A protein has these predicted regions:
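Conserved acyl-donor/pantetheine-binding loop and adjacent beta-alpha core of acyl/acetyltransferases
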Residues: 60-125
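Conserved active-site alpha-helix within GNAT-family acetyltransferase domains
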Residues: 147-149, 157-175, 179
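Conserved GNAT acetyl-CoA-binding A-motif
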Residues: 113-116, 144-157
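Conserved beta-strand-loop-alpha-helix junction that forms the acyl-donor binding cleft
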Residues: 118-125, 153-162, 179-180, 190-191
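A short beta-loop-alpha structural element at the N-terminal edge
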Residues: 1-16
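Conserved beta-hairpin
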Residues: 46-64
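Active-site rim helix/loop that mediates acceptor-substrate recognition in acyltransferases
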Residues: 28-50
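Conserved acetyl-CoA-binding loop-helix of GNAT-fold acetyltransferases
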Residues: 128-143
Length: 202
């Protein structure tokens, strides 16, 4: 599937995602800002071999294998972050985003490798509780967690997503009532090999 098509689809999904809606600066050319953010996410996913696609590209996930003490290339990260600051978030949002990210990262493991679901979305006309695309995507990344014997972490600001995650064997381990009035739920999937209940349907 062409990378530009994937970027377009991720950009459209991000518009329906509360966390992305909050960080992308409002005003003219907002669609362009969402697309810049989508390009950054997709290219980072490809670089890290973390992009998961449903066969028709209707479902897209980004699943990183993460190490708590892993260091990124400072200059490369700085250039990318400045690009996001100028073209996506704007300066007003920057401090709040950094504060929120620090809190989110504090909820993740302090040692040992783990999987982190940075993004999981389905194009609009393929969504729904009975979506084959959703089940396919879920099976893909839970099988990776089981295969690699690594816990899988995710967070969401959408209550109905919490219900779906829990149906798939995730446990809700933390709830954050944010200063802006929004709520964020933190979830993790512990593979059966690590003593978790796993997904009963897997």
């Amino acid at each position: 599937l062409d990378k530009e098509i994937i970027i377009d689809r991720v950009a459209d999904i991000l518009k329906d995602t509360p966390s992305a809606e909050q960080i992308v600066k409002k005003g003219d050319n907002r669609h362009k800002r969402f697309r810049i953010l989508a390009r950054y996410m997709v290219e980072k996913a490809i670089e890290k071999d973390a992009l998961i696609l449903e066969s028709d590209g209707l479902g897209i996930a980004i699943l990183f294998e993460t190490f708590p003490n892993e260091k990124e290339n400072f200059w490369k990260e700085s250039k990318e972050n400045l690009n996001l600051l100028f073209n996506v978030t704007g300066f007003k949002n920057a401090l709040k985003i950094l504060k929120n990210q620090k809190y989110i990262q504090q909820q993740r493991p302090k040692e040992g490798a783990y999987l982190y679901c940075w993004f999981w979305g389905i194009v609009q006309n393929s969504r729904g509780t009975d979506s084959k695309v959703g089940r396919y995507m879920k099976d893909r990344f839970l099988k990776i967690a089981e295969r690699d014997k690594l816990p899988l972490y995710a967070e969401t600001q959408t209550k109905k997503n919490v219900i779906v995650y829990r149906r798939y064997g995730f446990e809700l381990f933390h709830t954050w009532k944010r200063d802006d009035g929004n709520t964020m739920w933190f979830l993790r999937y512990i593979p059966k090999s690590l003593g978790g209940i796993g997904d009963p349907n897997l």
